[in-house]
Amino acid sequence: MNDLNIWKRAERIRKLLGEDSSSPIDLFALTNSINGLSIVNYPMGENISGMCVKGKHSNVFAINSLMTLGRQRFTLAHELFHLYYDNEPSTSICLKNIGAGNEKEIQADQFASYLIMPPLALTEMIQKLKESSSGVITLNEVVFLEQYYQISRQAVLYRLIQERELSHQDAEKMRQNIIQSAINLGYDDTLYKPSPLNKRYRTYGHYIKLAEKVLEKGLVSRGKYEELLLEAFRSDLVYGEDIDEEILD
């Protein structure tokens, strides 16, 4: 499959999710609207970024909560490729290194990159950045791009190398002191850290909605409903944990 076809597929998913073809997107919010999809945050070690498990009536994405928030967003986009365009019915396990693995995994990484950073929009953004930085992409521009699109340093460097805006040698220098480079430019460091401890085991989406639905219909008792939530690592919904004071503003 060539890059143009992957680009077109990424555009279709943007449209399916109700987004335009150029703006930054919040994939965690958007995927909550996909029928039958549950997303599970779970620590998986350092070599696996995520999994896609497809079923007859529902699907599950498992996202490695030990990876940075920026990488989790990229992984979520990667899993959307497996959900919509991978004809294999089995579970897909996705590796940490972007652009590695079999042909299907490489396509999924390319799809994720195009979904989050649409080619035309990225090209226009790069040109604007280069105009204000002596015609080259420096570390400052890399930090801006990862903050603008809310993805990891590795994902941004991977794409800039593909676009021939960075050499492998220059990119390698930018893999160091990632958090410090962002803080020095005035950015918050949340993007560069794993999920908070209280959210490293957590389920969102279809499973939670379904549990609520069967309770409302009287198909399960309150005790069973709470048991279902606890099995999905949602003690916060059972015991009211981690709920901040509400502010209507």
Identify the residue ranges that each predicted region occupies.
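Active-site hotspot residues in diverse enzymes, especially metal/ion-binding acidic/histidine motifs
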Residues: 1-249
